[in-house]
Curated annotation (Swiss-Prot):
Disordered: region residues: 161-195, 215-302
Protein name per the record: ABI gene family member 3
One Pfam family recorded for the sequence: Abi_HHR
Function description: May inhibit tumor metastasis. In vitro, reduces cell motility.
Organism: Homo sapiens (Human)
Keyword Transferase (UniProt): no
CDD domains named in the record: SH3_Abi
Tissue: Expressed in heart, lung, liver, pancreas, kidney, placenta and at low levels in brain and skeletal muscle.
Length: 366
């Protein structure tokens, strides 16, 4: 720092003053050399003396300029070093300020994280004036207050209590062997008011029908006889006497079906059973050995059509052969395909000759 101060206050100003003094001295030397050269009789000697003064003056000026430039560069270096020192001090001060701020922040965070002990006191404070309580009043329950809410349903308890049985629409008759027949549904008799036939007056057919009807009615109804109604008596065993005609009082009820109605209808004699069908006639040996004739083969085929080929095709686009073994054709030409290859090419015969052609140029002939 002292060196920088010495350069700024002494060395550089002295060098500048020396340059100003040399400037005035060089002007006087120039005037002297000019007068001496004009007044001298020996011009050559005067010229040599002038050259010597000039060389000395230039050397003196160069030395002073170099000395001043060196002092100036030295001053700039010292100022740069001082500036770097100041910058380092400022950076250090900034780091110290940041450290101080971080310490303060940590201290504040520590104060927030400390356990705060509240002074002990009464936590629950009872109110000074309690609200008045409503006196209890018993009210009867209203069980019909929600009757108008929701979807209503029909109450069937009264109807069920009247009839004592389920409705006929909800009854599904099971397929029992006693009542089921082939081709016609079982007949369900009335559940009440069954006619009573005198003993010994029931034939085998009516006895069988009564047993079947009673079994089907019990299986279909699925419910026992209601209280207060007596079950009809069981029919007696059939006798050898012929059944009498039904009395007049029974005419109001439906006539029970006979045995012919309960029995399944006889099979149609015109239609034979599947087991009685005659076996098909054997095929001839010629039909089994010969393959089907090729499509489109007939006596009116042109002469160029081969004896056997795969199919006939019609060209969609014209094609010109690129090789000697290829076919050339125009649009609408008929070709008999004799062989197909996996690469899409086909071999066939046309009216022009035999050769190969692309398979995507043709379509099957109708």
């Amino acid at each position: 720092m002292a060196e920088l101060q010495q350069l700024q206050e002494f060395e550089i100003p002295t060098g500048r003053e020396a340059l100003r003094g040399n400037h005035s001295a060089l002007l006087r030397v120039a005037d002297y050399c000019e007068d001496n050269y004009v007044q001298a009789t020996d011009k050559r000697k005067a010229l040599e003396e002038t050259m010597a003064f000039t060389t000395q003056a230039l050397a003196s000026v160069a030395y002073q300029v170099g000395n001043l430039a060196g002092h100036t560069l030295r001053m700039l270096d010292l100022q740069g070093a001082a500036l770097r020192q100041v910058e380092a001090r400022v950076s250090t001060l900034g780091q110290m300020v940041n450290m101080h701020m971080e310490k303060v922040a940590r201290r504040e965070i520590g104060t927030l994280a400390t356990v705060q002990r509240l002074p002990p006191g009464q936590k629950v404070i009872a109110p000074e004036n309690l609200p008045p309580l409503t006196p209890y009043c018993r009210r009867p329950l209203n069980f019909g207050c929600l009757d108008d809410i929701g979807h209503g349903i029909k109450d069937l308890s009264t109807q069920l209590s009247r009839t004592g049985t389920l409705s006929r629409k909800s009854i599904k008759a099971p397929a029992t062997p006693a009542s089921a027949t082939l081709g016609r549904p079982p007949r369900i008799p009335e559940p009440v008011h069954l006619p009573v036939v005198p003993d010994g007056r029931l034939s085998a057919a009516s006895s069988a029908f009564s047993l079947a009807s009673a079994g089907s009615a019990e299986g279909v109804g699925g419910a026992p006889t209601p209280k207060g109604q007596a079950a009809p008596p069981a029919p007696p065993l059939p006798s050898s006497l012929d059944p009498p005609p039904p009395p007049a009082a029974v005419e109001v009820f439906q006539r029970p079906p006979t045995l012919e109605e309960l029995s399944p209808p006889p099979p149609d004699e015109e239609l034979p059973l599947p087991l009685d069908l005659p076996p098909p006639p054997p095929l001839d040996g010629d039909e089994l050995g010969l393959p089907p004739p090729p499509p489109g083969f007939g006596p009116d085929e042109p002469s160029w059509v081969p004896a056997s080929y795969l199919e006939k095709v019609v060209t969609l686009y014209p094609y010109t052969s690129q090789k000697d073994n290829e076919l050339s054709f125009s649009e609408g030409t008929v070709i008999c395909v004799t062989r197909r290859y996996s690469d899409g090419w086909c071999e066939g015969v046309s009216s022009e000759g035999t050769g190969f052609f692309p398979g995507n140029y043709v379509e099957p002939s109708c």
